[in-house]
UniProtKB/Swiss-Prot annotation:
Positions of disulphide bridges: none
InterPro entries given in the database record: CRIB_dom (IPR000095), CRIB_dom_sf (IPR036936)
Region (Disordered): 84-107
SMART domains (UniProt xref): PBD
Coiled coil: none
Keywords recorded for this protein, A-Z: Cell membrane, Growth regulation, Membrane
Protein name as catalogued: CRIB domain-containing protein RIC9
GO cellular component, as recorded: plasma membrane
Oligomer status and interactors: Interacts with ARAC11/ROP1.
Membrane topology term: Peripheral membrane protein
Keyword hit for Cell membrane: yes
Function: Functions as a downstream effector of Rho-related GTP binding proteins of the 'Rho of Plants' (ROPs) family. Participates in the propagation of ROP GTPase signals in specific cellular responses. Is involved in pollen tube growth regulation through its interaction with ARAC11/ROP1.
Amino acid sequence: MATRFKGLYNKSFKCFSDIFDVEEEEEMEIGYPTDVRHVSHIGWDSSSSSAPSWLHEFKTSNNVLEPNSSWPFQDLKSAMEAFGEVESSKEMERESTKQNLKKKLSSKASLLCNSWSPRFSRSSKVLA
């Protein structure tokens, strides 16, 4: 029985130590040629055959800033115009709000200055 216990004891510790046995991964050393390609380099290499097919729809010419370019600046322009319209409508709303406030204040001021107004008569009685 002691030999059985000893065998079980040794086997369990052998398996238990295997849990903590960490295999080290191979480290990639910088400078050696690898198969890794960075996404930012695709399409900018000298060979265009290595570029993916979806990249061919983008032009790499110098006429990007020209108005006839196929670059999507038209979308940007329309977005900026829409933003300008929103800003102008906000400005118009602010102006109308200011005008409404002026009307309200002028009507309240006229009520305060009106001698037939109940406020004016009450305040004059209190002061007199």
